[in-house]
C-alpha cells in the first residue's frame, strides 16, 4: 500500500502531461459486444423467472403451516415497504446533491444523478425480490420435508429423496436471487456503457453510489430488525422460560422469522448487488486508462461469463445419494461454476485482447503503451487470482465456523465452564481468523498489484480485474446465502405448526445446519468482494485526483507539490486521515451493535410483559401478540438507520474538505484496513458461537436444556449483532465512503487550488459535515438514555416474577 502513497513513477496520463495518443472510445465492435453482454444479463432475468415458477409449483403443506407463512410474509412485506418509502425520500435528496458536484458537462452530470436513482432502484429491487420469494419458498421447503413423516393414509417417501427435494427447493430459491443480482448489475452497467460510451465510467459512479447506499441501509436496517428479534426471542424464550427455538408461545418468534428474510436475504442480496456494481465501476474507470478501448468492454465480459457459469452452477446443485450432506452438493455447484469460469475467461482473454500493449488502442499513458509483455497474461492471471481467492476464503471460513471442525468444537467444550468462557473463546477465534483472512485477501490484492510492474494504473486495473474474477462466482454465492434464511424459516414454520415431526424434522435440522455454514461462508466471500472493490475504487480515486490536479495546474508528487495533494503517509495530515478512517469503522460498528442492544431490550420487555400478563400463553390457552414485537423491531430499525448512514456519507466529506485529498486517500486506506479485520472478526466470531450452540443442541455436552446449552445461547446472542448486523454492514460502508470520496475529490481540489480557490467554502462544508455527524451520534446516544428514563417512570414493564419464568 505504501506505493500508492509514495509512487514517483508516473506516466504522462498521471501527471497531466499532454499525450499524442488517442483517447479511448467505444468502437463499433465493442458496442456490439456490450449489447451481446446485455442480452446475457436479460437471459439471467429470464432464467430467474423460470426458477420462480419451479419453486412456486411445490406444495405448501398444511393449513397451519400456510397460516404461519402468511404471517411471516405480511411482516416482511410491511417492513420492507416502510423502509423503501423512507429510503426513497433520501434517494431523491441525494439525486439533487449529486447535480451540484463538478462534471465535464451537464449531460454527464444529469446521467450520473439519473443512474444513481437506477442503481438505488436495482439494489432495492434485488433485495425485495429476494425477500418476496424467500417468504414463499420457506413453507414449501417445510412441506417437502414433511413428506418424510406422512400422516396416516398418505404414502411414505424415500428419506433421501425427500431431503434432496427440500434442498433443491431452497437452493433454487437462492438461484432466483442470484440471477437477479448478476442480471440487474450487468444490465445496468451495459446500459451506461451503451448510452455514454467513453464517458460511462463517470456516470457509473452515480450508479454505484445508488446501489451501495441502498444496500448499506438495507443491511443496517435489516440487521437491526432481525437481531433485535432474535436476541429478544432467545433471552426470554430459551434462557428464561426454557422453551425451544421457534416455539409458538414466544411472542418474538414471528418477528425472528421475518428478520431472517429482511436481514439475511434482502440485505445480503442488496449487498452483493452493490459489490457487483461498484467493482464494475472501478474496473471500467481504470480499464479506460489501462487498456484503452478494450478497457470499456473487457471488464463487462468477465462477469458475463460468470452469469453463464452461475446458471450451470445452480443446476449442478443436484443432491446425490453418495453426498454426505446438502453441503456436498452446494460445494459441487460452487466449484463447478468456478472452474468453468476460469476456463472460459482464459478463452475470452486470448480471443479478445491483443498480444502486446502497443496494440491496445486508446491508451493515453505512454508508459503503458510502451510496456513490454502480454496484456492477456496480466488479465488472465488477475481474474484467476479473484476466482482462486473466492475458493480459498470459502475453505478458510468453513474451517473456523463449521460444526465438524476443531475451532467450533473447542468453543462447544468451553460451554461446560459457563457463558464467560464461551464468549472469550469466540472472541479469540474471531481475532485469529481475521488475521488469516486479511492476509489471504492482502496477498490476493498484492499479487494482482505486482502484475502491473512499474505502472501504478495498470497495477490497480489488475486489482479491479481480480475483483471481477471474484464476481464470476457471485450468482452461486448469493444462492448459497439465501439458502440459509430459507432453511432456517422452514424449520421455524415446522416447529410453530407442529405438523413436521420425526424424520421430517431431522431433515429440516440438517438443512438448517447447512444453511448456517453457507451463510458464514458467503459472509467471508462478501467481505473479500468488498475489499477488492474498495481497493479498486481506491485506484479510481487516485485517477480522479490526478486528473483534478492537472486541471488546476498542480502535481501530486515531487518538488513543489502541495502537501494536501501528496499521498505520502509521512505527512501529518495524511497520518491523521489514516487514523480517522480506521476510527470511522469502529464508530460505525459500535453504533450498529448498540442499536441492536437497545431494540433487543425493548423486545425482551415486551415478551416478558406478555408472559406475565397472559399466563395462558404457556399452556397454549392464549395466543401471544406477535404483531407488537414486529412493530417494535420495525420502528427501531427504521429509526436507527440514519446515524450509521450519515456517518458513512459525511465522514469523507469532513476529512476531504478539512485536510485535503491526500488525507482523504489515507482515510480510505485506514478504513479498508480496519474494515477488513473488523468485518472478518465480527462475522467469524458470531458464526462460531452460532454453530457451537447448534453443536450442543445436537446432543453434545448435555444437549438442550443443560447449563452448557444456556452458556452457548448467551454466546450466540452476543454474536448475533456481530455476524448479522455490524459485520456485514461494513462491506457497503467501505464502498460508500470510497464512492463519496471519488465524487467529491474534484470539488475538494477545485476549492483548494486555482482560480476557484475558496477557503471559506471548504470551511463551511467541513463544519456542516461535522455538525451533521455530531448531532446524529448525539441523538443516537440520547435514545439509550431515554430508554432508561422510561423505566424510571414505569413506562417499561417491571422484570418478570422469577416464579413465572422458572
PLM region spans:
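Hydrophobic packing and interface segments
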Residues: 2-806
Amino acid at each position: 500500500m505504501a506505493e500508492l502513497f509514495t509512487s514517483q513513477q508516473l506516466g504522462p496520463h498521471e501527471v497531466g502531461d499532454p499525450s499524442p495518443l488517442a483517447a479511448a472510445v467505444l468502437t463499433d465492435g465493442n458496442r456490439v459486444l456490450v449489447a451481446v453482454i446485455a442480452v446475457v444479463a436479460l437471459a439471467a432475468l429470464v432464467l430467474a423467472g423460470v426458477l420462480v415458477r419451479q419453486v412456486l409449483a411445490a406444495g405448501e403443506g398444511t393449513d397451519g403451516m400456510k397460516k404461519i407463512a402468511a404471517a411471516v410474509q405480511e411482516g416482511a412485506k410491511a417492513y420492507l415497504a416502510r423502509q423503501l418509502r423512507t429510503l426513497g425520500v433520501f434517494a431523491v435528496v441525494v439525486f439533487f446533491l449529486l447535480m451540484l458536484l463538478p462534471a465535464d458537462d451537464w449531460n454527464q452530470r444529469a446521467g450520473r444523478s439519473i443512474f444513481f436513482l437506477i442503481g438505488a432502484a436495482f439494489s432495492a429491487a434485488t433485495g425485495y425480490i429476494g425477500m418476496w420469494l424467500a417468504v414463499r419458498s420457506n413453507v414449501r421447503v417445510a412441506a417437502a420435508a414433511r413428506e418424510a413423516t406422512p400422516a396416516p393414509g398418505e404414502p411414505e417417501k424415500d428419506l433421501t429423496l425427500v431431503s434432496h427435494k427440500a434442498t433443491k427447493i431452497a437452493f433454487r430459491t437462492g438461484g432466483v436471487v442470484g440471477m437477479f443480482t448478476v442480471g440487474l448489475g450487468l444490465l445496468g452497467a451495459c446500459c451506461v456503457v451503451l448510452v455514454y460510451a467513453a464517458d460511462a465510467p463517470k456516470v457509473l459512479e452515480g450508479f454505484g453510489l445508488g446501489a451501495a447506499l441502498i444496500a448499506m441501509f438495507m443491511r443496517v436496517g435489516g440487521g437491526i430488525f432481525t437481531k433485535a428479534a432474535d436476541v429478544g426471542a432467545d433471552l426470554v424464550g430459551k434462557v428464561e422460560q426454557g422453551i425451544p427455538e421457534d416455539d409458538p408461545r414466544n411472542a418474538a418468534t414471528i418477528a425472528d422469522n421475518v428478520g431472517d428474510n429482511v436481514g439475511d436475504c434482502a440485505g445480503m442480496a442488496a449487498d452483493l448487488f452493490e459489490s457487483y456494481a461498484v467493482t464494475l465501476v472501478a474496473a471500467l474507470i481504470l480499464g479506460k486508462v489501462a487498456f484503452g478501448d478494450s478497457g470499456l468492454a473487457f471488464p463487462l465480459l468477465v462477469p458475463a461469463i460468470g452469469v453463464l457459469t452461475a446458471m450451470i452452477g445452480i443446476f449442478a446443485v443436484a443432491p446425490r445419494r453418495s453426498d454426505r450432506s446438502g453441503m456436498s452438493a452446494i460445494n459441487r455447484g460452487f466449484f463447478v461454476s468456478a472452474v468453468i469460469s476460469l476456463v472460459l475467461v482464459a478463452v475470452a482473454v486470448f480471443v479478445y485482447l491483443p498480444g502486446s500493449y502497443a496494440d491496445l488502442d486508446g491508451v493515453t499513458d505512454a508508459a503503458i503503451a510502451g510496456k513490454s509483455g502480454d496484456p492477456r497474461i496480466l488479465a488472465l492471471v488477475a481474474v484467476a487470482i479473484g476466482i482462486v481467492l473466492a475458493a480459498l476464503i470459502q475453505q478458510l471460513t468453513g474451517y473456523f465456523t463449521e460444526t465438524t471442525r476443531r475451532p467450533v468444537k473447542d468453543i462447544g467444550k468451553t460451554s461446560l465452564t459457563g457463558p464467560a468462557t464461551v464468549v472469550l473463546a469466540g472472541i479469540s477465534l474471531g481475532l485469529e481468523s481475521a488475521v488469516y483472512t486479511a492476509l489471504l485477501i492482502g496477498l490476493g490484492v498484492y499479487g494482482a498489484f505486482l502484475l502491473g510492474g512499474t505502472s501504478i494504473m495498470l497495477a490497480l486495473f489488475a486489482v479491479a480485474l481480480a475483483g471481477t474474477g471474484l464476481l464470476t462466482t457471485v450468482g452461486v454465492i448469493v444462492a448459497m446465502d439465501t439458502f440459509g434464511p430459507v432453511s432456517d424459516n422452514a424449520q421455524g414454520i415446522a416447529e410453530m405448526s407442529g405438523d413436521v415431526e420425526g424424520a421430517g424434522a431431522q431433515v429440516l435440522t440438517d438443512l438448517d445446519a447447512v444453511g448456517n455454514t453457507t451463510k458464514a461462508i458467503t459472509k467471508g466471500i462478501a467481505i473479500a468482494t468488498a475489499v477488492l472493490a474498495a481497493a479498486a475504487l481506491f485506484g479510481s480515486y487516485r485517477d480522479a485526483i490526478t486528473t483534478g490536479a492537472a486541471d488546476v495546474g498542480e502535481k501530486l508528487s515531487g518538488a513543489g507539490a502541495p502537501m494536501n495533494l501528496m499521498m505520502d503517509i509521512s505527512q501529518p495530515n495524511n497520518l491523521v486521515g489514516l487514523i480517522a478512517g480506521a476510527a470511522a469503522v469502529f464508530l460505525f460498528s459500535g453504533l450498529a451493535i448498540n442499536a441492536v442492544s437497545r431494540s433487543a431490550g425493548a423486545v425482551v420487555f415486551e415478551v416478558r410483559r406478555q408472559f406475565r400478563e397472559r399466563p395462558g400463553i404457556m399452556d397454549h390457552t392464549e395466543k401471544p401478540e406477535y404483531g407488537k414485537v414486529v412493530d417494535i423491531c420495525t420502528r427501531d430499525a427504521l429509526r436507527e438507520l440514519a446515524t450509521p448512514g450519515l456517518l458513512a456519507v459525511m465522514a469523507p466529506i469532513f476529512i476531504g474538505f478539512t485536510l485535503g485529498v491526500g488525507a482523504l486517500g489515507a482515510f480510505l486506506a485506514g478504513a479498508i484496513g480496519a474494515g477488513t479485520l473488523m468485518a472478518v472478526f465480527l462475522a467469524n466470531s458470531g458464526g462460531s458461537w452460532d454453530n457451537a450452540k447448534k453443536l450442543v443442541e445436537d446432543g453434545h455436552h448435555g444437549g438442550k436444556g443443560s447449563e452448557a446449552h444456556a452458556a452457548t445461547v448467551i454466546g450466540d446472542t452476543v454474536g448475533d449483532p456481530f455476524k448479522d448486523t455490524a459485520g456485514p454492514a461494513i462491506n457497503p460502508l467501505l464502498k460508500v465512503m470510497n464512492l463519496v470520496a471519488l465524487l467529491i475529490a474534484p470539488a475538494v481540489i477545485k476549492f483548494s487550488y486555482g482560480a476557484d480557490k475558496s477557503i471559506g467554502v471548504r470551511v463551511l462544508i467541513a463544519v456542516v459535515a461535522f455538525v451533521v455527524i455530531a448531532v446524529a451520534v448525539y441523538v443516537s446516544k440520547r435514545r439509550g438514555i431515554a430508554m432508561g428514563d422510561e423505566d424510571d417512570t414505569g413506562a417499561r414493564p417491571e422484570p418478570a416474577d422469577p416464579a413465572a419464568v422458572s
